[in-house]
UniProtKB/Swiss-Prot annotation:
Gene giving rise to this polypeptide: AGTR1
Topology, Extracellular side: 1-25, 90-98, 166-190, 269-278
UniProt keywords, alphabetically: Cell membrane, Disulfide bond, G-protein coupled receptor, Glycoprotein, Lipoprotein, Membrane, Palmitate, Phosphoprotein, Receptor, Transducer, Transmembrane, Transmembrane helix
Species annotation: Pan troglodytes
Protein name stated in the entry: Type-1 angiotensin II receptor
Biological process according to GO: G protein-coupled receptor signaling pathway; inflammatory response; maintenance of blood vessel diameter homeostasis by renin-angiotensin; positive regulation of cytosolic calcium ion concentration; regulation of vasoconstriction
Positions annotated with a glycan in the UniProt record: N4, N176, N188
Length: 359
Protein backbone atom coordinates (compact mmCIF):
# COMPACT_ATOMS: atom_id res chain seq x y z
CA UNK A 1 0.00 0.00 0.00
CA UNK A 2 2.24 2.75 -1.31
CA UNK A 3 0.88 6.16 -2.25
CA UNK A 4 2.49 8.55 -4.72
CA UNK A 5 3.71 11.87 -3.32
CA UNK A 6 6.01 13.89 -5.57
CA UNK A 7 8.99 13.80 -7.92
CA UNK A 8 12.35 15.33 -7.12
CA UNK A 9 15.72 14.99 -8.88
CA UNK A 10 14.20 12.40 -11.21
CA UNK A 11 13.37 10.09 -8.29
CA UNK A 12 9.77 9.74 -7.21
CA UNK A 13 9.11 10.38 -3.55
CA UNK A 14 6.40 8.19 -2.08
CA UNK A 15 4.80 7.25 1.21
CA UNK A 16 4.59 3.70 2.57
CA UNK A 17 1.44 2.91 4.55
CA UNK A 18 3.17 -0.03 6.27
CA UNK A 19 6.78 1.14 6.68
CA UNK A 20 7.79 -1.67 9.04
CA UNK A 21 6.38 -4.53 6.94
CA UNK A 22 9.02 -7.17 6.28
CA UNK A 23 11.77 -5.17 7.94
CA UNK A 24 13.30 -7.55 10.48
CA UNK A 25 16.92 -7.90 11.52
CA UNK A 26 16.93 -11.67 11.01
CA UNK A 27 15.75 -11.15 7.41
CA UNK A 28 18.59 -8.71 6.77
CA UNK A 29 21.08 -11.36 7.92
CA UNK A 30 19.49 -14.64 6.80
CA UNK A 31 18.44 -13.70 3.26
CA UNK A 32 21.81 -12.26 2.11
CA UNK A 33 23.47 -15.39 3.52
CA UNK A 34 21.09 -17.63 1.58
CA UNK A 35 21.55 -15.55 -1.57
CA UNK A 36 25.31 -15.94 -1.24
CA UNK A 37 25.00 -19.72 -0.87
CA UNK A 38 22.66 -19.91 -3.88
CA UNK A 39 25.10 -17.78 -5.90
CA UNK A 40 28.14 -19.94 -5.14
CA UNK A 41 26.37 -23.30 -5.54
CA UNK A 42 24.42 -22.14 -8.60
CA UNK A 43 27.38 -20.64 -10.45
CA UNK A 44 29.54 -23.69 -9.75
CA UNK A 45 26.87 -26.28 -10.57
CA UNK A 46 25.42 -24.64 -13.66
CA UNK A 47 28.86 -23.82 -15.08
CA UNK A 48 29.79 -27.49 -14.78
CA UNK A 49 26.52 -28.47 -16.47
CA UNK A 50 27.30 -26.15 -19.40
CA UNK A 51 30.83 -27.57 -19.71
CA UNK A 52 29.65 -31.20 -19.51
CA UNK A 53 26.82 -30.81 -22.03
CA UNK A 54 28.67 -28.62 -24.52
CA UNK A 55 32.22 -30.00 -24.39
CA UNK A 56 31.79 -33.59 -23.19
CA UNK A 57 28.37 -34.63 -24.50
CA UNK A 58 28.84 -32.45 -27.62
CA UNK A 59 25.21 -31.25 -27.57
CA UNK A 60 23.92 -34.17 -29.65
CA UNK A 61 20.41 -34.69 -28.28
CA UNK A 62 17.21 -32.69 -28.05
CA UNK A 63 17.03 -32.87 -24.26
CA UNK A 64 20.64 -31.72 -23.93
CA UNK A 65 19.69 -28.54 -25.82
CA UNK A 66 16.95 -27.82 -23.28
CA UNK A 67 19.24 -28.59 -20.33
CA UNK A 68 21.98 -26.34 -21.71
CA UNK A 69 19.56 -23.44 -22.12
CA UNK A 70 18.17 -24.10 -18.64
CA UNK A 71 21.66 -23.79 -17.16
CA UNK A 72 22.39 -20.63 -19.19
CA UNK A 73 19.14 -19.00 -18.02
CA UNK A 74 20.08 -19.79 -14.42
CA UNK A 75 23.54 -18.28 -14.88
CA UNK A 76 22.02 -15.04 -16.24
CA UNK A 77 19.92 -14.75 -13.10
CA UNK A 78 22.72 -15.73 -10.73
CA UNK A 79 24.94 -12.91 -12.00
CA UNK A 80 22.48 -10.37 -10.57
CA UNK A 81 22.01 -12.18 -7.24
CA UNK A 82 24.86 -10.32 -5.44
CA UNK A 83 22.95 -7.08 -6.09
CA UNK A 84 19.92 -8.43 -4.25
CA UNK A 85 22.12 -9.74 -1.44
CA UNK A 86 23.63 -6.28 -0.91
CA UNK A 87 20.20 -4.65 -1.21
CA UNK A 88 18.75 -6.87 1.53
CA UNK A 89 21.83 -6.59 3.76
CA UNK A 90 21.49 -2.80 3.54
CA UNK A 91 17.94 -3.13 4.91
CA UNK A 92 16.29 -2.66 1.51
CA UNK A 93 18.30 0.37 0.48
CA UNK A 94 19.12 0.27 -3.25
CA UNK A 95 22.55 1.83 -3.98
CA UNK A 96 23.00 0.75 -7.62
CA UNK A 97 20.88 3.25 -9.53
CA UNK A 98 17.77 2.96 -11.66
CA UNK A 99 19.23 1.06 -14.63
CA UNK A 100 20.58 -1.82 -12.54
CA UNK A 101 17.28 -1.85 -10.66
CA UNK A 102 15.47 -2.51 -13.94
CA UNK A 103 18.05 -5.01 -15.25
CA UNK A 104 18.22 -7.02 -12.02
CA UNK A 105 14.43 -7.11 -11.73
CA UNK A 106 14.01 -8.17 -15.35
CA UNK A 107 16.59 -10.93 -14.80
CA UNK A 108 14.50 -12.42 -11.99
CA UNK A 109 11.36 -12.37 -14.12
CA UNK A 110 13.21 -13.69 -17.17
CA UNK A 111 14.63 -16.65 -15.25
CA UNK A 112 11.23 -17.57 -13.87
CA UNK A 113 9.56 -17.79 -17.27
CA UNK A 114 12.54 -19.21 -19.19
CA UNK A 115 13.14 -21.97 -16.64
CA UNK A 116 9.49 -22.93 -16.35
CA UNK A 117 9.00 -22.96 -20.14
CA UNK A 118 12.15 -25.03 -20.67
CA UNK A 119 11.12 -27.57 -18.02
CA UNK A 120 7.71 -27.79 -19.68
CA UNK A 121 9.27 -28.41 -23.10
CA UNK A 122 11.59 -30.99 -21.55
CA UNK A 123 8.60 -32.88 -20.13
CA UNK A 124 6.81 -32.78 -23.50
CA UNK A 125 9.95 -33.98 -25.27
CA UNK A 126 10.31 -36.84 -22.79
CA UNK A 127 6.66 -37.79 -23.32
CA UNK A 128 6.99 -37.85 -27.11
CA UNK A 129 10.26 -39.77 -26.96
CA UNK A 130 9.04 -42.47 -24.58
CA UNK A 131 5.35 -42.85 -25.45
CA UNK A 132 5.56 -42.09 -29.20
CA UNK A 133 9.21 -42.73 -30.14
CA UNK A 134 8.61 -43.56 -33.81
CA UNK A 135 5.90 -41.01 -34.60
CA UNK A 136 7.82 -38.14 -33.02
CA UNK A 137 11.23 -38.89 -34.52
CA UNK A 138 10.84 -36.48 -37.44
CA UNK A 139 9.55 -33.70 -35.17
CA UNK A 140 12.11 -34.12 -32.42
CA UNK A 141 15.16 -32.77 -34.22
CA UNK A 142 18.04 -30.58 -33.09
CA UNK A 143 16.78 -27.77 -35.33
CA UNK A 144 13.32 -27.86 -33.77
CA UNK A 145 14.84 -27.89 -30.28
CA UNK A 146 17.06 -24.88 -31.01
CA UNK A 147 14.22 -22.90 -32.60
CA UNK A 148 12.01 -23.76 -29.61
CA UNK A 149 14.67 -22.43 -27.23
CA UNK A 150 14.95 -19.19 -29.23
CA UNK A 151 11.18 -18.75 -29.00
CA UNK A 152 11.29 -19.44 -25.25
CA UNK A 153 14.00 -16.81 -24.73
CA UNK A 154 11.96 -14.29 -26.73
CA UNK A 155 8.78 -15.06 -24.76
CA UNK A 156 10.65 -14.82 -21.46
CA UNK A 157 12.11 -11.50 -22.57
CA UNK A 158 8.63 -10.27 -23.49
CA UNK A 159 7.29 -11.36 -20.09
CA UNK A 160 10.13 -9.41 -18.45
CA UNK A 161 9.24 -6.10 -20.12
CA UNK A 162 6.90 -4.98 -17.31
CA UNK A 163 9.84 -5.16 -14.89
CA UNK A 164 11.93 -2.97 -17.19
CA UNK A 165 9.10 -0.48 -17.65
CA UNK A 166 7.54 -0.29 -14.20
CA UNK A 167 10.33 -1.24 -11.79
CA UNK A 168 12.10 1.89 -10.60
CA UNK A 169 14.04 3.45 -7.77
CA UNK A 170 11.81 5.31 -5.30
CA UNK A 171 12.52 7.38 -2.21
CA UNK A 172 10.19 6.53 0.66
CA UNK A 173 9.78 9.71 2.67
CA UNK A 174 8.44 8.26 5.91
CA UNK A 175 11.33 5.76 6.21
CA UNK A 176 14.00 7.88 4.48
CA UNK A 177 15.27 5.03 2.28
CA UNK A 178 15.67 4.47 -1.48
CA UNK A 179 14.13 1.23 -2.75
CA UNK A 180 13.95 -0.71 -6.02
CA UNK A 181 10.29 -1.60 -6.37
CA UNK A 182 7.15 -1.74 -8.47
CA UNK A 183 4.87 1.24 -8.00
CA UNK A 184 1.43 1.72 -9.49
CA UNK A 185 0.09 5.24 -9.99
CA UNK A 186 -3.40 4.20 -8.97
CA UNK A 187 -4.72 1.42 -6.77
CA UNK A 188 -7.49 1.05 -9.36
CA UNK A 189 -4.92 0.07 -12.00
CA UNK A 190 -5.47 -3.28 -13.70
CA UNK A 191 -1.72 -3.68 -14.28
CA UNK A 192 -0.90 -5.46 -10.98
CA UNK A 193 -3.83 -7.82 -11.52
CA UNK A 194 -2.60 -8.63 -15.01
CA UNK A 195 1.00 -9.16 -13.93
CA UNK A 196 0.02 -11.24 -10.91
CA UNK A 197 -2.36 -13.48 -12.86
CA UNK A 198 0.19 -13.87 -15.66
CA UNK A 199 2.79 -14.99 -13.15
CA UNK A 200 0.36 -17.37 -11.43
CA UNK A 201 -1.19 -18.87 -14.57
CA UNK A 202 1.44 -18.64 -17.30
CA UNK A 203 4.39 -18.95 -14.93
CA UNK A 204 3.07 -21.82 -12.84
CA UNK A 205 -0.42 -23.29 -13.32
CA UNK A 206 -0.36 -24.15 -17.03
CA UNK A 207 3.26 -25.41 -17.00
CA UNK A 208 2.57 -27.52 -13.90
CA UNK A 209 -0.51 -29.12 -15.49
CA UNK A 210 1.48 -29.92 -18.65
CA UNK A 211 4.39 -31.34 -16.65
CA UNK A 212 2.03 -33.37 -14.45
CA UNK A 213 0.14 -34.74 -17.48
CA UNK A 214 3.31 -35.55 -19.42
CA UNK A 215 4.99 -37.49 -16.62
CA UNK A 216 1.75 -39.24 -15.65
CA UNK A 217 1.40 -40.56 -19.20
CA UNK A 218 5.08 -41.52 -19.22
CA UNK A 219 4.66 -43.44 -15.97
CA UNK A 220 1.60 -45.28 -17.30
CA UNK A 221 3.45 -46.28 -20.47
CA UNK A 222 6.51 -47.48 -18.56
CA UNK A 223 4.39 -49.20 -15.92
CA UNK A 224 2.64 -51.19 -18.63
CA UNK A 225 5.96 -52.13 -20.24
CA UNK A 226 7.54 -53.22 -16.95
CA UNK A 227 4.46 -55.23 -15.98
CA UNK A 228 4.88 -57.19 -19.19
CA UNK A 229 8.53 -57.76 -18.27
CA UNK A 230 7.53 -58.45 -14.64
CA UNK A 231 10.19 -55.94 -13.60
CA UNK A 232 8.60 -54.50 -10.44
CA UNK A 233 11.78 -52.99 -8.87
CA UNK A 234 12.47 -51.03 -12.06
CA UNK A 235 8.82 -49.89 -12.13
CA UNK A 236 9.10 -48.63 -8.55
CA UNK A 237 12.29 -46.71 -9.39
CA UNK A 238 10.64 -44.97 -12.34
CA UNK A 239 7.63 -44.04 -10.21
CA UNK A 240 9.90 -42.48 -7.57
CA UNK A 241 11.83 -40.47 -10.19
CA UNK A 242 8.65 -39.14 -11.81
CA UNK A 243 7.11 -38.29 -8.44
CA UNK A 244 10.31 -36.47 -7.47
CA UNK A 245 10.27 -34.42 -10.69
CA UNK A 246 6.62 -33.35 -10.30
CA UNK A 247 6.78 -32.67 -6.55
CA UNK A 248 10.14 -30.90 -6.89
CA UNK A 249 8.59 -28.43 -9.33
CA UNK A 250 5.35 -27.99 -7.38
CA UNK A 251 6.76 -27.40 -3.92
CA UNK A 252 9.54 -25.18 -5.27
CA UNK A 253 7.14 -22.67 -6.76
CA UNK A 254 3.78 -22.89 -4.95
CA UNK A 255 4.86 -20.83 -1.87
CA UNK A 256 6.19 -18.00 -4.06
CA UNK A 257 3.09 -18.03 -6.26
CA UNK A 258 0.76 -17.84 -3.24
CA UNK A 259 2.57 -14.88 -1.71
CA UNK A 260 2.82 -13.18 -5.11
CA UNK A 261 -0.97 -13.31 -5.31
CA UNK A 262 -1.31 -11.90 -1.78
CA UNK A 263 1.16 -9.14 -2.64
CA UNK A 264 -1.03 -8.12 -5.58
CA UNK A 265 -4.02 -7.85 -3.24
CA UNK A 266 -1.97 -5.60 -0.96
CA UNK A 267 -0.83 -3.41 -3.86
CA UNK A 268 -4.46 -3.02 -4.95
CA UNK A 269 -5.53 -2.02 -1.45
CA UNK A 270 -7.82 -5.03 -1.10
CA UNK A 271 -5.74 -6.12 1.90
CA UNK A 272 -5.05 -3.13 4.13
CA UNK A 273 -3.96 -4.83 7.34
CA UNK A 274 -0.29 -4.04 8.01
CA UNK A 275 0.07 -7.27 9.98
CA UNK A 276 -0.77 -9.28 6.87
CA UNK A 277 1.50 -7.04 4.80
CA UNK A 278 4.29 -7.77 7.27
CA UNK A 279 3.75 -11.53 6.92
CA UNK A 280 3.76 -11.29 3.11
CA UNK A 281 6.81 -9.01 2.91
CA UNK A 282 8.69 -11.22 5.37
CA UNK A 283 7.80 -14.47 3.60
CA UNK A 284 8.41 -13.22 0.05
CA UNK A 285 12.25 -13.28 0.10
CA UNK A 286 12.15 -16.70 1.80
CA UNK A 287 9.92 -18.12 -0.94
CA UNK A 288 12.24 -16.57 -3.53
CA UNK A 289 15.17 -18.42 -1.97
CA UNK A 290 13.26 -21.71 -2.09
CA UNK A 291 12.09 -21.24 -5.68
CA UNK A 292 15.33 -20.01 -7.20
CA UNK A 293 17.64 -22.31 -5.26
CA UNK A 294 15.70 -25.32 -6.52
CA UNK A 295 15.55 -23.68 -9.93
CA UNK A 296 19.34 -23.44 -10.07
CA UNK A 297 19.62 -27.11 -9.10
CA UNK A 298 17.30 -28.22 -11.91
CA UNK A 299 20.03 -28.73 -14.57
CA UNK A 300 21.98 -30.93 -12.15
CA UNK A 301 18.83 -32.74 -11.03
CA UNK A 302 17.71 -33.58 -14.56
CA UNK A 303 21.24 -34.20 -15.78
CA UNK A 304 21.96 -36.78 -13.11
CA UNK A 305 19.06 -38.89 -14.35
CA UNK A 306 21.44 -40.01 -17.10
CA UNK A 307 24.46 -42.27 -16.76
CA UNK A 308 26.49 -40.47 -19.43
CA UNK A 309 25.98 -37.12 -17.73
CA UNK A 310 27.08 -38.56 -14.38
CA UNK A 311 30.08 -40.18 -16.03
CA UNK A 312 31.25 -36.97 -17.73
CA UNK A 313 30.45 -34.86 -14.67
CA UNK A 314 32.71 -37.03 -12.52
CA UNK A 315 35.40 -36.91 -15.21
CA UNK A 316 35.25 -33.12 -15.15
CA UNK A 317 35.60 -33.05 -11.36
CA UNK A 318 38.69 -35.25 -11.75
CA UNK A 319 40.10 -32.85 -14.39
CA UNK A 320 39.85 -35.43 -17.16
CA UNK A 321 39.55 -33.42 -20.42
CA UNK A 322 36.94 -34.32 -23.06
CA UNK A 323 38.02 -36.33 -26.07
CA UNK A 324 38.99 -34.23 -29.06
CA UNK A 325 36.77 -36.28 -31.32
CA UNK A 326 33.80 -38.39 -30.41
CA UNK A 327 33.61 -41.85 -32.01
CA UNK A 328 30.27 -42.81 -30.55
CA UNK A 329 27.38 -43.60 -32.86
CA UNK A 330 24.43 -41.25 -33.25
CA UNK A 331 22.40 -41.79 -30.11
CA UNK A 332 19.07 -40.38 -29.04
CA UNK A 333 19.12 -42.13 -25.70
CA UNK A 334 18.56 -38.94 -23.78
CA UNK A 335 15.21 -38.39 -25.37
CA UNK A 336 14.11 -41.81 -26.63
CA UNK A 337 13.57 -45.26 -25.27
CA UNK A 338 16.68 -47.29 -24.63
CA UNK A 339 16.48 -51.05 -24.53
CA UNK A 340 18.45 -53.54 -22.51
CA UNK A 341 18.22 -57.28 -23.17
CA UNK A 342 17.69 -59.54 -20.22
CA UNK A 343 20.75 -61.09 -18.66
CA UNK A 344 19.11 -64.51 -18.66
CA UNK A 345 17.07 -64.45 -21.85
CA UNK A 346 18.21 -63.77 -25.38
CA UNK A 347 17.11 -60.46 -26.84
CA UNK A 348 15.67 -62.33 -29.79
CA UNK A 349 13.25 -64.26 -27.59
CA UNK A 350 12.26 -61.61 -25.05
CA UNK A 351 11.20 -58.04 -25.78
CA UNK A 352 13.38 -55.61 -23.87
CA UNK A 353 11.93 -53.14 -21.37
CA UNK A 354 12.08 -49.39 -21.88
CA UNK A 355 14.42 -47.36 -19.74
CA UNK A 356 13.70 -43.85 -18.38
CA UNK A 357 17.04 -42.05 -18.57
CA UNK A 358 18.44 -38.64 -19.34
CA UNK A 359 21.68 -39.03 -21.25
Amino acid sequence: MILNSSTEDGIKRIQDDCPKAGRHNYIFVMIPTLYSIIFVVGIFGNSLVVIVIYFYMKLKTVASVFLLNLALADLCFLLTLPLWAVYTAMEYRWPFGNYLCKIASASVSFNLYASVFLLTCLSIDRYLAIVHPMKSRLRRTMLVAKVTCIIIWLLAGLASLPAIIHRNVFFIENTNITVCAFHYESQNSTLPIGLGLTKNILGFLFPFLIILTSYTLIWKALKKAYEIQKNKPRNDDIFKIIMAIVLFFFFSWIPHQIFTFLDVLIQLGIIRDCRIADIVDTAMPITICIAYFNNCLNPLFYGFLGKKFKKYFLQLLKYIPPKAKSHSNLSTKMSTLSYRPSDNVSSSTKKPAPCFEVE
